[in-house]
A protein has these predicted regions:
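Structural core segment of the AMP-binding/adenylate-forming
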Residues: 77, 104-191
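Gly/Ser/Thr-rich phosphate-binding loop
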Residues: 301-305, 314-375
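N-lobe entry segment of adenylate-forming
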Residues: 1-58, 62-77, 81, 149, ...
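Conserved AMP-binding A3 loop
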Residues: 59-61, 212-236
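Conserved structural elements of the adenylate-forming
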Residues: 64-69, 199, 208, 227-249, ...
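Conserved pre-ATP/AMP-binding loop-to-beta segment of ANL
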Residues: 180-216, 223, 246-253
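Conserved AMP-binding/adenylate-forming
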Residues: 53-58, 70-116, 128, 137, ...
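Conserved AMP-binding/adenylation subdomain of ANL enzymes
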Residues: 235-253, 261-302, 312, 316
Length: 375
């Protein structure tokens, strides 16, 4: 007779473990911050490229130095352990430094979609009671309005040109002149960094309960919610991908086309590849028509995107008859993909010498992770 006392549930039996490498079963979690995990994993690779932004390359040594400078600048601006800094931006090197710098000093980033209205941004600032706001210059006016009647004391302004190679930066500023009228509490990013030159870069002691970021759900089951994710969320994800060592190897390239304000974009598009020693090519605002050209230029082994990215790839005439055997793991999430569209993409990949089909992830912001199913 079967009773509840002698039933072995799947969660206890864990039959899926037979497919796992024994070396990774019950592997202990890294007891360190997300920043320290990246640093430890690349301590012997400091001269290798960590980030690439429109042709400008930043080594892992550059990444560490710039993160520490940003941490010092936060301290000089009055940021303390437990504070939440709101960031309204697309993905840029500065946003990446800000994430790891805030994590280093025990603060938290609240990442907000720059397409939101002033009222929407205001709501997210109020939700976490930010005193410091970081925003792109192209959305400054909206953020200035959003910061009214909040506790925001200082606004740090980024330009997409801040990390561009000099010729591109000059060209960008000529074609996109900054016509904002800045309030007295606004400070440009480079001056913000300069203000921190005498402040401490030391990290706070590791706290396993510290939330390094607030991201927002997609609102699938109701209004979008702010979700606090810890260092453990990010490090666990990176460690899981490290177990997939047949596909992910140090020195490979991941092309980041996802925004920072969703867990998928930051966990899979930034922290995971950096923790695994990959180069992250930052594409802050992807033009779908240029996807094929970008793939041929950078030859990224890895990419995390949404289904429409891969449908665009399969239809791109620039990729016709091209050898794409460099592709190792292209994954789709964030939206549904029909059976027909998936077949079209997989047929395209197979016809272009790609060994593996499209990986589909079924994710959940609250756990900063996803499941994938193979038939």
């Amino acid at each position: 007779m079967t009773t509840t006392s002698n039933v072995l549930y799947a969660s206890q039996a864990r039959p899926w473990l037979k497919y796992y490498d024994p070396n990774y079963i019950d592997q202990p979690m890294p007891e360190c911050s997300a920043f320290d995990f990246v640093r430890q994993q690349n301590k012997n690779r400091l001269s290798e490229t960590a980030l690439e932004y429109y042709g400008r390359k930043f080594t892992y040594a550059d990444f560490i130095v710039n993160t520490k400078k940003t941490a010092a600048a936060f301290r000089a601006a009055g940021v303390q352990k437990g504070d939440i800094i709101t960031v309204v931006s697309v993905m840029t090197p500065e946003v990446i430094y800000a994430f790891y710098a805030a994590d280093r000093i025990g603060a938290t980033l609240n990442l907000v979609d720059p397409r939101y209205s002033a009222d929407g941004i205001h709501e997210y600032i109020e939700e976490v009671d930010s005193h410091l706001l970081i925003c792109l210059n192209v959305v400054y006016d909206r953020c200035r309005q959003a910061a009214r009647r909040t506790h925001v004391e200082r606004v740090i302004v980024l330009s997409p040109a801040d990390s561009l190679p000099l010729p591109l930066a000059i060209g960008y500023k000529i074609s996109n002149p900054d016509r904002n009228k800045y309030d007295s509490n606004a400070l440009m990013w480079k001056q913000f960094i300069a203000n921190g030159q005498d402040a401490s870069t030391a990290g706070e002691p590791y706290d396993p309960d510290h939330a390094c970021v607030v991201v927002h759900t997609g609102g699938t089951t109701g209004s979008p919610k702010g979700v606090m994710l810890t260092d453990r969320n990010f490090n666990a994800l990176a460690q899981q991908f490290a177990a997939w060592h047949a596909l992910f190897r140090k020195g490979q390239t991941l092309m980041n086309v996802m925004p920072p304000f969703i867990a998928y974009g930051y966990a899979c598009g930034v922290h995971m590849p950096l923790a695994l020693g990959l180069k992250v090519v930052i594409i802050p605002n992807l033009d779908p028509a240029k996807l094929g050209s970008l793939l041929l230029k950078h030859k990224p082994e890895h990419m995390f995107g949404v289904p429409s990215h891969y449908q665009q790839m399969a239809a791109d005439p620039k990729l016709k008859n091209k050898d794409l055997s460099f592709i190792r793991n292209y994954a789709a999430g964030g939206d549904a993909i029909s059976i027909g569209a998936e077949k079209t993409v997989n047929d395209f990949l197979a016809a272009h010498n790609v060994e593996y089909p499209l990986a589909k992830g079924y994710g959940m912001t609250e756990v900063s992770s996803a499941a994938t199913i193979a038939a």
